[in-house]
């Protein structure tokens, strides 16, 4: 019988700070991703009062061979028993809007680069396409004011930015339904995770003091956080270097404000 802590998939990191490393992702990681997914998709069609099930339809151009496509799109959508639109072809703004319209897509994950291309090709898309969008997540780079305004005014959604990485995905972001986005911020720690800004010694930095974004091995309930990867494939030294005590470092520098952003 498969166990939660057994490896499910080997995903290589992007290698932005060195050679790509193979991160072993366990089966339990899907559960660890769900709170961020639900928040970034504005509850993904679940009302909590009027409806007990979701009617969401998901689409993203993110490839299903990496963390973004698997953990931010495909697997969470299937976990909730909802359809996800698949397309094996090159992205284009026309294709994107055609798929959104044809399949009545309600929720999506779109990169800022894709949104910029869509904005350039179709400044006023609802003049040509019937859109049913209710929520959208974006990640990979800063969305920026122009794209944020385009999503709000032309697509009819407040885009939720998200931050994570292959090893510990979906840890910080926004949820326009329950907390507003702040300019220049990537959001708050998603429910369940202990996310902090720490110094070189693993101590939590005071408000406004720069440090490394990190996630604690144990969640807010004191249980092992299921979001964590198992380690790097055949690279124990790199796995050890990822941690300071029970904190797993992202390698990204940030500051925290008094409201937790």
Give the residues covered by each predicted segment.
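Conserved pre-ATP/AMP-binding loop-to-beta segment of ANL
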Residues: 1-12, 19, 44-57
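Gly/Ser/Thr-rich phosphate-binding loop
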Residues: 79, 105-110, 119-181, 194
């Amino acid at each position: 019988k498969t166990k939660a802590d057994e490896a499910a998939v080997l995903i290589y990191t992007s290698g932005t700070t060195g050679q790509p490393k193979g991160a072993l992702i366990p089966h339990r990681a899907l559960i660890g991703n769900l709170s961020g997914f639900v928040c970034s998709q504005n509850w993904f069609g679940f009302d909590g009062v009027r409806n007990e099930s979701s009617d969401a339809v998901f689409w993203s151009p993110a490839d299903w061979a990496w963390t973004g496509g698997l953990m931010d799109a495909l697997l969470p959508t299937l976990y909730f028993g909802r359809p996800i639109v698949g397309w094996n072809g090159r992205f284009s703004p026309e294709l994107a809007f055609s798929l959104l319209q044809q399949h009545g897509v309600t929720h999506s994950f779109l990169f800022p680069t894709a949104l910029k291309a869509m904005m350039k090709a179709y400044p006023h898309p609802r003049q040509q396409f019937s859109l049913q969008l209710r929520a959208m997540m974006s990640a990979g780079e800063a969305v920026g004011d122009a794209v944020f305004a385009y999503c709000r005014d032309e697509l009819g959604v407040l885009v939720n930015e998200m931050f994570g990485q292959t090893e510990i995905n979906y840890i910080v972001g926004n949820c326009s339904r329950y907390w507003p986005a702040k300019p220049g911020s990537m959001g708050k720690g998603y429910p369940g995770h202990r996310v902090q800004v720490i110094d070189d010694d693993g101590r939590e930095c005071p408000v406004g003091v720069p440090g490394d974004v990190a996630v604690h091995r144990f969640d807010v309930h004191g249980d092992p956080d299921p979001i964590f990867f198992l380690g790097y494939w055949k690279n124990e030294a790199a796995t050890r270097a990822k941690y300071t005590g029970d904190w797993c470092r992202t390698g990204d520098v940030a500051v925290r404000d008094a409201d937790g952003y």
